[in-house]
């Protein structure tokens, strides 16, 4: 507990000139720029065909994630069968990457000592390979015995899918790491863009920088740091990005540079704050038709395919128990500091299940055609569905929910008809809003005000009975009245349409969602309990959810 965890993410194009005989990447002597710190001191050099070997030797990460594209596919024509699917493409690309690591040798020099071996021997036990969807036309080569085979590859897809698929995969993998490691003193993510091609570096960087702030906001802090600082502070989360100098021929010296170091969070300071979008509609769209690719693949069936993909998206939403309105309110609760509503709308869907099912259905809607010719094979891949922005919006909300619920002090907290204790709400504030000093102060003050007002009027209230917060504030008025902010009580009835008024919407947001007319309070078992009175009228829950997410951008 309280350890430092390092994750190395490496983006690669195709390392093979002719799979599996000759490499495209040259053997280089990798050295490190002065600003890079190595765990056991810098080696004199690392001789290898990839920066992965050098950075692994320097950083000693516990986890290694390699990101490749389906566009590096090569396939022996004799092994192609009629049922060859996109899942087979993924497995073949994973094998292509793994085979490179098994065959690529490396040499490390430290002082007068040398270490030689193969990259896979160093990283294999900690390796995850993510094969993200690409797009374009490619000519790849492979050797089958003494024969050279040309693989002409056409991949029809959306660049947005590379980003979305990668973010979902990284979210699931990173959550597994956080769950496995427990509380941390530091989480360091090292992003190596040296071997990325075309759009890969930019979209990978975007995926990582969109994901890390969500993790940083709610992650459990290690005990060692708490003791060292003398007070509870959050884990330090860093992102270091690397790039190397070009390698033009075997034997070139290439210096690896740290081109950026971003402290995503240190103490109460954020280099990047978490940001959320809300689903585009009450039923999130997790898959949409890729019209361009569908019309290329099946020009007379695009309409039918569109209905199929739309129905599949709806089935996914039902299967995963997702509600766009609740998810939007949850996003608003995180962004606007609404602790009671945050618990009331907390998703129950597991992120791992979500990622597995969404990406599985995405892959099932990829069509793979091939034709074998003399000394060549033509493979055409059509992504009939795409991953819209709703997919990302939901994934980030589920990730936030999972990390918040994983905190030991919140493991047994939930919203029910019995309400939530004030003690638990204060614990939630410490976790869910510690990334924003403003939200933490506001929510804590509002909870303190409820406690103060209750204690001031406790003689006239019966223990164990729910009382509207408005009645507690307006001690002179009958049940159902409420007091505006400031001055002497000027009470008015708590009407069903209270949130139709703009000033009451502002009051709801300014007072952490603890609106005097909507919150019920009771004291029981020595603690104060709160809940929403959504029974005031049937439209009230809808109104609360709509007001809660004011200011957030809708995914489109």
Role assignments for model-derived ranges:
Residues 1-187, 203, 209-556:
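Long, low-complexity, Lys/Arg-enriched
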Residues 193-201:
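Acidic, metal-coordinating catalytic cores used for nucleic-acid/nucleotide bond scission
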Residues 188-192:
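Short helix/strand-bridging catalytic loops that position acidic/His residues to coordinate divalent metals
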